[in-house]
Amino acid sequence: MQQDFAADDLDARADEAPTPAWAPPAPVRDPALLLERTLASHDRTSDLWVFGYASLIWRPEFPAAEQRLARVHGHHRALRMHSRINRGTPEQPGLVFALVRGGSCQGMVYRIERERAEAELRRLWRREMPSGVYDPKWLQCHTNQGPVSALAFTLSRHSPNYTGELDDDALVAILRHARGRFGSTLEYLLKTAVCLRDCGIRDLAIERQVALARRHGLAA
């Protein structure tokens, strides 16, 4: 997943933030339709598992009956999604993490009890899917207690929000300048790095990005 907390930058906490002076971007796809498809594909007699890879680890915002470290194969965490409200602006877009095809990703899976699953998923949708930019997928997540199928918010390389490859100069410029209503892209990167480290998760790409920020005097 991941927005910083949402697809192209809206959040369930929008009412707590200043009202923007311009209208938010139009949805890429119909979020309501995607939600109904996801609900229809979930066995409502079972608990709901959700995979978090960035802000859902350090700010899940839903009651989890259980959480486990987990690894997904076939997708990796990448700082390659534009953020034009939360961590940047339309004039100076920031970046947030997304789950992109290829490689693997270690994160956290959360179990939401079935009695609360639909209500919590609807809340989560308002946070992550207001513009329908993510591709919600059920992914096999491997944990020490066994595999679980969890909902993950992935990003297609064909998405208009996918940045593609960014060279170091472009990344440094974004880390130096991009700031949105929830703070800067740099703060988001550093917070994610600290959270993953505290969870015992190593991400070499993030470590490299943090080191790059330090070399340019952007982080201590």
Label each residue range with its predicted role:
Residues M1-A220:
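A glycine-rich, hydrophobic/aromatic-adjacent loop/helix-cap motif
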